[in-house]
């Protein structure tokens, strides 16, 4: 996967009318299938290859995670782990990019399956320890 630099000089809030394609959010459903190379490959082919829907936009969800002490989230697909965690040994916040390996597996497969990939990144919430509800 190539790194794309974000331009801070273009202050436009639109893409100036350029159509970039079709896509889907990778939130939740890929968390459920990304453990399996077979399911990951099949999903990438069905959604992003020319043999399937030929989508090209992937919306990657950076999960906020949930307080490990809470047990209110029952659906395994919606438990998207966050990258940021507090390391008690170093007393610092650190990133663990492998925490969300299921979604990353599907993202890579989808990226490789399409000819003109666009990746958008979003988050539905901050890390749990940055909220009052926790």
Identify the role of each PLM range.
Residues 2-134:
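N-terminal catalytic cores of secreted or lumenal carbohydrate-active enzymes
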